[in-house]
């Protein structure tokens, strides 16, 4: 599993630990990833994703997984999230 958010594309960053004496050593800043099951209202089922805590807040803010994926750019999404986005779009087109 890569350390990358499936919805926002957030990944590890590099930087320095800086001591009181201003000694610098390399370190990695890892994203706060969580395995979650988000409910899709259109599909009527849960979708398992590995997303960052910030992405989870963004999903809640936008009104759920369906609304988040509708506005999300395809370049930022993982292959699994892109597949779910297309399934949702297909289901919404069939309903209308």
From Swiss-Prot:
Region (Disordered), start-end ranges: 1-22
Keyword Chaperone: no
Any Gene Ontology CC annotation: cytosolic large ribosomal subunit
Keywords, in A-Z order: Ribonucleoprotein, Ribosomal protein
Classification via PANTHER family: 39S RIBOSOMAL PROTEIN L28, MITOCHONDRIAL, LARGE RIBOSOMAL SUBUNIT PROTEIN BL28M
Source organism of the structure: Ruegeria sp. (strain TM1040)
InterPro entries: Ribosomal_bL28, Ribosomal_bL28/bL31-like_sf, Ribosomal_bL28_bact-type, Ribosomal_bL28_sf
GO molecular function term, any single one: structural constituent of ribosome
Protein family (similarity comment): Belongs to the bacterial ribosomal protein bL28 family.
Name used for this protein in its record: Large ribosomal subunit protein bL28
BP GO terms, sorted: translation
The organism's place on the tree of life at top rank: Bacteria
Entries under SUPFAM superfamilies matching the protein: L28p-like
Lineage: Bacteria, Pseudomonadati, Pseudomonadota, Alphaproteobacteria, Rhodobacterales
């Amino acid at each position: 599993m890569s350390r990358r958010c499936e919805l926002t594309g957030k990944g590890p960053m590099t930087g320095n630990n800086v001591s009181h004496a201003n000694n610098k050593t390399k370190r990695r800043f890892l994203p706060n990833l969580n395995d979650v099951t988000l409910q899709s209202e259109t599909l009527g089922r849960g979708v398992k994703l590995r997303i960052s805590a910030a992405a989870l807040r963004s999903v809640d803010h936008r009104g759920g997984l369906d609304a988040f994926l509708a506005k999300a750019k395809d370049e930022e999404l993982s292959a699994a999230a892109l597949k779910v986005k297309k399934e949702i779009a297909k289901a919404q087109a069939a309903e209308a």
